[in-house]
Amino acid sequence: MKELIEKIENWAEERNLINGSTPQKQFIKLMEEFGKLCAGISKNNIDMIKDSIGDCFVVMVILNKQVGKQSRGMEFFSFGNPDMSDFTIDEIVSDLADYAAHGYERPFPVVLGLSNIADVYQLNFEDCIRQAYNEIKDRKGKMINGVFVKEADLGAKND
């Protein structure tokens, strides 16, 4: 997991996401990805859930790096195996709000929530992250107003 986090950080640095964007813009991206996760859950779409869990984690690694925090430790969780009654989306939304309110200092409850969602859907958390990284590792694009826009979306309108 540590190597995967380092690859994500390097990918973000190569695309100027660390210094060329802001934590606030990355948090908006995190909310976008979390919205996709909620859509996947509401549709019981396992592929969308897996993709979104990984995407949320990738954005959190980037955000963590932007605020100067070491991403070490994000890989040292010992996650349980909750059932659906132990997990609610509103708890993660609350954790996301706390994460932003406290200057992005406390990513762990959000990461734990993402891991719990993976467990509920019998997904391997690290596989979710690996899939997300493999999807973005060769992605090209450009920074526009502090937001990385992937090459495929550069010609799209209002997407």
Which residues does each PLM region occupy?
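Flexible "arm" and connector segments at domain edges
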Residues: 1-159
